[in-house]
């Protein structure tokens, strides 16, 4: 019996190793294009802080700037409908690719912490010569968006946080010690990258991953799946995502965007849009955020999960357009009262 158990275990382990190795090989064959060659002609690269960041634009150059920051696995094109909706109102919409996703340059030293990412967002404002903008951050992009607002508060007219993964704890909190098994996994690059190649950057799993974030699986349409898959041909995407994982799963320090006092001190309007059925960042996180920020408004989208702009684009864009309009009015009122 014991001999049989060990044989079965060895066979299963060998099968797992072969699967991981196979998908790693496929990733290496697929991820061969330079970002500049793979990127769509609808955008361009700008130097932002330490990296060349890919951006896409819509709307008049003299419109109210609205800068979009996407979530995990997405890229600037995921905001296309929202950008068009804002451009139709006269706003200037700018969406960026936050590394390691999309087509932006990846940092050689794996600097993916929220503060580094926040500096890149401010760098995009610098690259465009933008004095003040409305910042829109979704999911994992919410933390860097908030970091940008804390780094340069005078550059932010308003915040729009969409199902934001902020990990707000307490002001005296320290970065938690990750479990030993997780530390070992993250530190073992060949294993880490093999798992990433199998599940995260594997086009065969794109639809399943997307469906795991939304309430209605049918909303993961072929068009959306292809959109998410498009950057997966960029050279070294798998090792870049692998290098990003420690910043997501085992950060070494508590970011300013994770401290309640950072929100209590915000002086700009904060518009919070949250899916009622979000299982990734549950609604109570959005409700807590609305209580922390003094100038916050919470809008809850019914029967929507973690990605409102995919699940109910018309409803989301209506809320977004209203939020940006309110931000413009409040900014004008503040300027006239000086």
Residue positions per predicted region:
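Acidic catalytic loop of the alpha/beta-hydrolase fold
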Residues: 277-281
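Alpha/beta-hydrolase fold catalytic core
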Residues: 1-64, 88-91, 130-131, 324-338
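Catalytic active-site module of serine/aspartate enzymes centered on a nucleophile-bearing elbow/loop
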Residues: 294-338
